[in-house]
Amino acid sequence: MPIGVPKVLFRNPGDPISSWVDVYNRLYRERLLFLGQGISTDLSNQLIGLMMYLSMEDENKELYLFVNSPGGWVIPGIAIYDTMQFVRPDIHTICIGLAASMGSFILAGGQLTKRIAFPHARVMIHEPYSAFYMAQVGEFVMEAVELMKLRETLTRVYAERTGKPFWVVHEDMERDIFMSATEAQAYGIVDFVAVQGK
């Protein structure tokens, strides 16, 4: 079995010859985006670039962002969220598998009434963490202040997107809260749980 991203035949409109493109490239052309790993600066920049390009290409055609992510870096995650709010097309978010930490933040950032979780998906929220354990005291204090600002931002956005009171979200984020698809719907992170269809 070959290793790597599968290739599929694709013909651009007006082009007489089909060419082999990787499956993700083909799906992007249908406005289907994937967040399928931990959020990093590189991944964030790629998704942001795709959202901007597809928005410029057709600002009325909706985008679909499939989320299966354990989370990742906070600032790149916020950058994805902000871009989702900035671009003209509505962005549907669909949780397939796991949307944890910043993954759930991005899931909640989809267009209201267009956020979906598959029936067996899992969603997890918690407060942001810092990796600066070996810093000097002054740096550690500055890092703690910045972390508190980020926590405030995340809590405020979750409260706005879910309709929950700020204090409820603040308390819930103090520990890892795992939810089923129906629990995530009740919490307000998603609007619907997908039903199985054939």
Curated annotation (Swiss-Prot):
EC no. given is 3.4.21.92
Reaction catalysed by this enzyme:
Hydrolysis of proteins to small peptides in the presence of ATP and magnesium. alpha-casein is the usual test substrate. In the absence of ATP, only oligopeptides shorter than five residues are hydrolyzed (such as succinyl-Leu-Tyr-|-NHMec, and Leu-Tyr-Leu-|-Tyr-Trp, in which cleavage of the -Tyr-|-Leu- and -Tyr-|-Trp bonds also occurs)
Q: Which CDD domains match?
A: S14_ClpP_2
The molecular function GO annotations come to: ATP-dependent peptidase activity; ATPase binding; serine-type endopeptidase activity
Q: Which GO terms describe its biological process?
A: protein quality control for misfolded or incompletely synthesized proteins
Which top-level group of life is the source organism from?
Eukaryota
Active site annotation, chain numbering: S101 (nucleophile), H126
Under Gene3D superfamilies, the record lists: 2-enoyl-CoA Hydratase, Chain A, domain 1
Cellular component annotations (GO), alphabetically ordered: chloroplast stroma; endopeptidase Clp complex
Q: Which UniProt keywords apply?
A: Chloroplast, Hydrolase, Plastid, Protease, Serine protease
Query: Can you say where in the cell this protein is located?
Result: Plastid, Chloroplast stroma
The primary location reported for this protein is: plastid
The annotated subunit structure for this chain is:
Component of the chloroplastic Clp protease core complex.
Q: What does this protein do?
A: Cleaves peptides in various proteins in a process that requires ATP hydrolysis. Has a chymotrypsin-like activity. Plays a major role in the degradation of misfolded proteins.
What the record says about family reads: Belongs to the peptidase S14 family.
Name of this chain's protein: ATP-dependent Clp protease proteolytic subunit
Which gene carries the instructions for this protein? clpP
